[in-house]
């Protein structure tokens, strides 16, 4: 191998290494922590202020972005993960933990659970913040089952939420 060719390969390798080091895609990096809903947080699909709507909220962190994408309903969180035009490099997904809801049923906007670890009550009588039936997330399966006993519906995990449920009108 000539010196020129060796130098070119070394330079190329150094560039690739530098770019990959700066990409932020370190698989060992911990996911970002959930953020508090701020007064200026706006729902991704509805464009409305999150604090103006009752019910559980969601936030998704896309790799390479510091701020989360906000959602005013849990069905919207699922839609974002399913729609082909939305980003697929997701660093973290959080939903309000309704196990921490107040006695009036209002979501505690400081209580978050990893969406992939949550238990969801779907097809219940609960009307979410956008005026439609919504999936209700819980960190605790027992609390989810109790909610379903009272409000109807069934308990499923993140991967088991049917697409036709997410996109039903």
Residue ranges and their predicted role:
Residues 18-21:
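C-terminal motif of bacterial Sec signal peptides marking the signal peptidase cleavage site
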Residues 1-12:
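Bacterial N-terminal signal peptides that target proteins for export
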Residues 47:
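Cys/His-coordinated zinc-binding microdomains
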Residues 137-169:
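C-terminal partner/receptor-binding element of secreted or periplasmic proteins
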Residues 27, 51:
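Short functional micro-motifs and their immediate structural scaffolds
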Residues 91-139, 143-145, 155:
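Thiol/selenol-based redox catalytic cores and closely related redox-interacting motifs
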Residues 43:
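Short cysteine-rich clusters marking metal-coordination/redox-active sites
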Residues 23-25:
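Bacterial signal peptide processing site
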């Amino acid at each position: 191998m000539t010196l020129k060719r060796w130098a070119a390969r070394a330079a190329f390798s150094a560039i690739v290494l530098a770019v990959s080091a700066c990409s932020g895609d370190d698989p060992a990096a911990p996911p970002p922590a959930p953020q508090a809903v701020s007064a200026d947080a706006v729902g991704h699909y509805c464009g409305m202020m999150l604090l103006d709507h009752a019910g559980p909220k969601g936030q998704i962190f896309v790799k390479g972005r510091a701020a989360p994408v906000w959602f005013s309903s849990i069905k919207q969180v699922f839609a974002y993960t399913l729609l082909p035009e939305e980003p697929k490099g997701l660093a973290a997904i959080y939903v309000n933990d309704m196990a921490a809801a107040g006695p009036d049923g209002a979501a505690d906007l400081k209580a978050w659970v990893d969406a992939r670890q949550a238990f969801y009550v779907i097809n219940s009588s609960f009307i979410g913040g956008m005026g439609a039936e919504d999936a209700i997330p819980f960190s605790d399966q027992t609390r989810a089952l109790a909610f379903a006993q009272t409000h109807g519906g069934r308990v499923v995990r993140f991967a088991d939420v049917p697409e036709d449920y997410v996109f039903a009108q």
